[in-house]
Amino acid sequence: MPDQATVLIVDDEKPITDAYARWLEDDYQVRTAYSGSEALEKLDDAVDVVLLDRRMPDLSGEDVLDRIHEQGLTCRVALVSAVEPDFDILELGFDAYLEKPVSDADELLETVETLLQRTTYDSQMQQFLSLATKKAALETKKSPEELKASEEYESLREELADLRAQLSDTATGLDDEDLRAEFYDPSD
């Protein structure tokens, strides 16, 4: 992630989009789109979080969400909608749901920050699991003496310990709901 995360705000109601942009622009790089089609033009790998209206006339938020997944983009998505959530949301691949009206800048800022923390947690967990797999492979093939004599193995152990601490710190910043969302599998 760059030093300042990039947030794409997508809503066909210009006053809402512009208000959200004002609330976030001091903390994040902000892009705005006033339609689903425009959102697709502004979406790229630099976008970290998308705040996406669910119902738009030209291309719905659900269609944009499908395209995000089809393109393999790794941004986090919060649906921001006046539509009360119903069971149909279970099939949608988003990370947060905000019900309009969102009239509190703090709620929007907190949502973006939480989504960014989840991204950090995912990245740290992937790195941790990759290193843990390497450590396990070495431990099954090398003798304890060889492991003890290896500077590379000791460095790996230290890196794993550091990552474990980072994961713990990041997880502390997430609440139970965030962690449930992290491990939710819609296919279950």
Positions of predicted regions on the chain:
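Conserved acidic segment of CheY-like receiver
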Residues: 3-24, 50
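Helix N-cap/capping motif at the beta->alpha junctions
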Residues: 14, 32-41, 61-63
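Active-site T/S-Asp motif of two-component receiver
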Residues: 50-53, 65
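Active-site residues of response regulator receiver
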Residues: 53-54, 60
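The feature encodes the CheY-like receiver
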Residues: 57-58, 71
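A short, hydrophobic beta-strand element within the central beta-sheet of small alpha/beta folds
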Residues: 73-85, 98-99
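Receiver (REC) domain switch/output surface
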Residues: 107-120, 125
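C-terminal output/effector regions of signal-responsive regulators
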Residues: 121-188
